[in-house]
């Protein structure tokens, strides 16, 4: 039985990537097998996949979800939209010296007022005066992860989105997908690798460390996903033909496994709190492309469950010694599912 301290590691600060590389597919790729680590360029992913394999991407689009504002009492606030509920309402985190009262107005971006509603846990309901997506796009700022030290600029607005981002709703990018450019997608298709898409709106909880030493006590954050019947059909056809189901990122993995709890993948939409730790039996995904994750994070636990705890520990030690770039703008790994015990 693993505990929180088993997922801690020391990372030199200079290995946290602060900016993306000039070319998406120029990142490094660590091919990981038990007791075998191979350093590759990310474009080599074409050679690691076979005709008939299926790549499953998350097509969520990152919202410009960060706002700075002023309460009607004059106090400064920072707002991070966590989830769009409907056309006029959102759930959001609010940072302020004093918690805002229900009914209070907050002026955001010196452009429009929102009204504070009820609080549930760490989130407030906020009512927007007009279409949420239009106001966010016009006045919000891209919410870069907390370990990136610069404010988002126009370059980030392009590079912190995947080239196939389509469905707005995330507050963090599905970062494994950032390595794919159109030329690489075309090369994969030309080889006979199939492409499919799910949507999972990544929440701010993805950056939160687990705080309970006993992992069973962790309250997993919730994220919304949807999987189409078309994607389900592609997955099942690939499985029948003996191809690999390759999740592009932990968010695609989480959606696919959440929708497979009955034993086989089902189409539909739902909120998921699936917390994958070592001992979990994977039902759909056989390969995983993923970036390097934060210490004590749920994502580090997920990849340890998938490829094996000792294998991941060795991979991270190798990556640090070889000066791989870590986290959202960093390099990637190609993982194979550990055989069930």
UniProtKB/Swiss-Prot annotation:
Q: In which pathway does it act?
A: tRNA modification; tRNA-queuosine biosynthesis
Q: Which GO terms describe its cellular component?
A: cytoplasm
User: What is the first-listed, main subcellular location in coarse terms?
Assistant: cytoplasm
Q: What is its EC number?
A: 2.4.99.17
What is stated as this protein's family in its record? Answer: Belongs to the QueA family.
* HAMAP family xref list: QueA
Instruction: Write down what this protein is called.
Output: S-adenosylmethionine:tRNA ribosyltransferase-isomerase
What organism does the UniProt record list as the source? Janthinobacterium sp. (strain Marseille) (Minibacterium massiliensis)
Q: Which gene encodes it?
A: queA
């Amino acid at each position: 039985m693993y505990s929180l301290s088993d997922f801690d590691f020391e990372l030199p600060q200079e290995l946290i990537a602060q900016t993306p590389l000039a070319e998406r597919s120029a990142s490094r790729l660590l091919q990981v097998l038990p007791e075998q680590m191979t350093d590759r360029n990310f474009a080599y992913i074409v050679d690691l996949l076979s005709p008939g394999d299926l790549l499953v991407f998350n097509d969520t689009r990152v919202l410009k979800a960060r706002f700075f504002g002023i309460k009607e009492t004059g106090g400064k606030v920072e707002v991070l939209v966590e989830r769009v509920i409907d056309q006029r309402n959102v759930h959001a985190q609010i940072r302020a010296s004093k918690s805002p009262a229900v009914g209070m107005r907050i002026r955001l971006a010196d452009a429009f007022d929102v009204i504070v509603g009820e609080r549930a846990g760490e989130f407030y309901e906020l009512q927007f005066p007009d279409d949420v997506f239009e106001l966010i796009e016009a006045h919000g700022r891209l919410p870069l992860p907390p370990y990136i030290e610069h404010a988002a600029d126009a370059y980030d607005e392009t590079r912190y989105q995947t080239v196939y981002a389509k469905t707005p709703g995330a507050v963090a990018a599905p970062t494994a997908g950032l390595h794919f450019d159109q030329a690489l997608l075309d090369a994969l298709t030309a080889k006979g690798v199939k492409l499919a898409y799910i949507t999972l709106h990544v929440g701010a909880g993805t950056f939160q460390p687990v705080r309970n030493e006993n992992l069973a006590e962790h309250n997993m954050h919730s994220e919304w996903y949807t999987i189409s019947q078309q994607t389900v059909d592609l997955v099942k056809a690939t499985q029948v033909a003996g191809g690999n189901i390759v999740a592009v990122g932990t968010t695609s993995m989480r959606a696919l496994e959440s929708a497979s709890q009955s034993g086989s993948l089902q189409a539909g939409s739902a909120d998921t709190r699936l917390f994958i730790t070592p001992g979990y039996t994977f039902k759909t995904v056989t390969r995983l492309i993923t970036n390097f994750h934060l210490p004590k994070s749920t994502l580090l636990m997920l990849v340890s469950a998938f490829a094996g705890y000792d294998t991941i520990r060795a991979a991270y030690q190798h990556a640090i010694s070889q000066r791989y770039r870590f986290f959202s703008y960093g390099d990637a790994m190609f993982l194979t599912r550990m055989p069930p015990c």
